[in-house]
């Protein structure tokens, strides 16, 4: 894990990185005693969030080989360009609805959150969301109860409804009907959602390049 990359100097030129982000989280948290849930695509850095404003986090990770396939359709870029960004572009930025976020490489992104161990965490693999949605929902419930002393109690009917409402096919239908802010001119946002598409799409050379460069984190997450 390249700790040197996460030094202050490497983050100073990103205008979103400042103490204002921490202060914003403090203000939002102080507005109510309820649990606030924030979504981000960013790598984790001490100037982005910390234990003074963060009770815990849920990190959703996906097989980088499938990310390449998904992002190719989403961005309109070529496979090799996306693979290069995924592996080597440490300062890769995205702009989400006007907000800049630092993605960095897949490996640095994963490690930045896995090494954030001063608050409780729940790591969820995208593939498990597809295969075992009920188990994942129960894990999320228990995690939220733990970090905020909640008393969420879900019946089987509640769980089934959650799974139905968040089912990929249902979300895709809703996007067809109502649109979705994060869709692009190249692709709808909820396009396919399948796992292991890379096996039929990426070349052997492309797969080897990804696996050779990301093998430590991929092995840790049992992707290889």
What residue spans do the PLM features occupy?
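PAPS/PAP-binding and catalytic site of the sulfotransferase fold
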Residues: 1, 123-150, 162, 170
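PAPS-dependent sulfotransferase catalytic domain
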Residues: 1-124, 184, 189-224
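Short, solvent-exposed coil/turn elements at secondary-structure transition points
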Residues: 43, 63, 127-129, 165-168
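An amphipathic alpha-helix signature
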Residues: 65-68, 134-141, 156-160, 207, ...
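Polar helix-capping/helix-linker motif
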Residues: 116, 155, 167-170
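Acidic/polar loop patches that form or flank catalytic/metal-binding clefts of enzymes
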Residues: 149-157
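Short linear loop/turn motifs
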Residues: 157-164, 224
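Short acidic/His-enriched helical or mixed secondary-structure segments at domain edges of catalytic enzymes
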Residues: 161-186
């Amino acid at each position: 894990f390249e700790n040197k990359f996460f030094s202050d100097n490497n983050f100073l030129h990103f205008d979103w990185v400042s103490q204002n982000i921490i202060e914003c989280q403090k203000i939002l948290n102080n507005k109510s005693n309820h649990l606030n849930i924030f979504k981000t695509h960013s790598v984790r850095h001490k100037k982005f969030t910390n234990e003074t404003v963060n009770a815990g986090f849920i990190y959703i990770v996906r097989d980088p080989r499938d990310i390449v396939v998904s992002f190719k359709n989403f961005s309109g870029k070529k496979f090799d360009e996306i693979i290069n960004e995924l592996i080597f572009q440490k300062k890769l930025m995205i702009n989400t609805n006007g907000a800049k976020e630092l993605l960095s490489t897949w490996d640095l992104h994963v490690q930045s959150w896995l090494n954030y161990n001063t608050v409780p965490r729940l790591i969820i693999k995208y593939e498990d969301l597809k295969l075992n949605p009920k188990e994942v929902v129960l894990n999320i419930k228990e995690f939220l109860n733990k970090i905020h002393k909640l008393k969420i109690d879900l019946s089987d009917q509640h769980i089934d409804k959650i799974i139905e409402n968040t089912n990929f096919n249902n979300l895709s239908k809703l996007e067809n009907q109502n649109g979705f802010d994060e869709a692009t001119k190249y692709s709808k946002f909820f396009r396919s959602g399948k796992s292991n598409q890379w096996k039929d799409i990426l070349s052997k050379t492309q797969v080897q390049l990804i696996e050779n460069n990301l093998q430590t984190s991929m092995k840790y997450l049992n992707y290889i």
